[in-house]
Amino acid sequence: MSTSRKLKTHGMRRGKNRAPHKGVKRGGSKRKYRKSVLKSRKRGDDASRNYRSHL
């Protein structure tokens, strides 16, 4: 149970914190980065959504 819980928090934390942080760090080429981020973000959202539904 502990491992499952840890994994869930880690996944959520990683997806929510990692993307915005990267964008903020790379303020210079925000426009260029945004395009790739949009694709990755969409995929991540879908994955997390499916993961949540399964749980």
Swiss-Prot record:
Localization, UniProt: Nucleus; Chromosome
Source organism phylogeny: Eukaryota, Metazoa, Chordata, Craniata, Vertebrata
Record's keyword terms, sorted: Chromosome, Developmental protein, Differentiation, DNA-binding, Nucleosome core, Nucleus, Phosphoprotein, Spermatogenesis
Basic residues bias spans: 1-42
Phenotype reported upon loss of the gene: Reduced fertility in males. Testis weights and sperm production are normal but sperm motility is severely reduced. A significant proportion of Prm2 remains unprocessed. Male mice lacking both Tnp1 and Tnp2 are completely infertile, but protamine alone are capable of histone eviction. Chromatin in mature spermatozoa shows defects in density.
GO cellular component: male germ cell nucleus; nucleosome; nucleus
Covalent S-S links between cysteines: none
Positions of region (Disordered): 1-55
Positions where Phosphoserine occurs in the chain: 36, 40
Family (UniProt): Belongs to the nuclear transition protein 1 family.
GO BP field: chromatin remodeling; flagellated sperm motility; heterochromatin formation; negative regulation of DNA-templated transcription; nucleosome disassembly; positive regulation of protein processing; sexual reproduction; single strand break repair
Tissue spec. comment: Testis-specific.
Coiled coil (UniProt feature): none
Stated role: Plays a key role in the replacement of histones to protamine in the elongating spermatids of mammals. In condensing spermatids, loaded onto the nucleosomes, where it promotes the recruitment and processing of protamines, which are responsible for histone eviction. The histone H2AB1-H2BC1/TH2B dimer is required for loading of TNP1 onto chromatin.
Protein name: Spermatid nuclear transition protein 1
GO molecular function, one term: DNA binding
